[in-house]
């Protein structure tokens, strides 16, 4: 038997002229509600046999695909990190107890506290 160049799988008939695709049945199967489908074949008939396969195989849409995180994404900042930054912002802006002010040329000067 000579190789025909086509894969031999159970979804296609052996003799293509023997069976004609029933498009009405194909449309009925397509418009059924989405259900889990474990069909691994990528032939034209299997790509269009249900809406889920059409989305996955025909259009390439995948739902709930999570990105893999690299090994260095959860590195901690030394010295407290975000908590230290939050405390500094709270002290400087909300309580107005920061003793430094920034001048126009970018230098910092010490501010004297006004005591009442």
Swiss-Prot record:
One of its GO terms (cellular component) is host cell nucleolus. Residues 37-53 are annotated as: Cysteine-rich. It is found in: Host nucleus, Host nucleolus. InterPro entries: IV_Tat, Tat_dom_sf. A motif (Nuclear localization signal, and RNA-binding (TAR)) lies at residues 65-73. One of its GO terms (biological process) is positive regulation of viral transcription. Keywords: Activator, Host nucleus, Host-virus interaction, RNA-binding, Transcription, Transcription regulation. Residues 54-64 are annotated as: Core. GO terms for molecular function: RNA binding; RNA-binding transcription regulator activity. Its main location: host cell. Belongs to the lentiviruses Tat family. Interacts with host CCNT1. Associates with the P-TEFb complex composed at least of Tat, P-TEFb (CDK9 and CCNT1), TAR RNA, RNA Pol II. Interacts with CCNT2; the resulting complex is unable to bind to TAR RNA. Transcriptional activator that increases RNA Pol II processivity, thereby increasing the level of full-length viral transcripts. Recognizes a hairpin structure at the 5'-LTR of the nascent viral mRNAs referred to as the transactivation responsive RNA element (TAR) and recruits the cyclin T1-CDK9 complex (P-TEFb complex) that will in turn hyperphosphorylate the RNA polymerase II to allow efficient elongation. The CDK9 component of P-TEFb and other Tat-activated kinases hyperphosphorylate the C-terminus of RNA Pol II that becomes stabilized and much more processive. This is Protein Tat. It comes from Simian immunodeficiency virus (isolate African mandrill) (SIV-mnd).
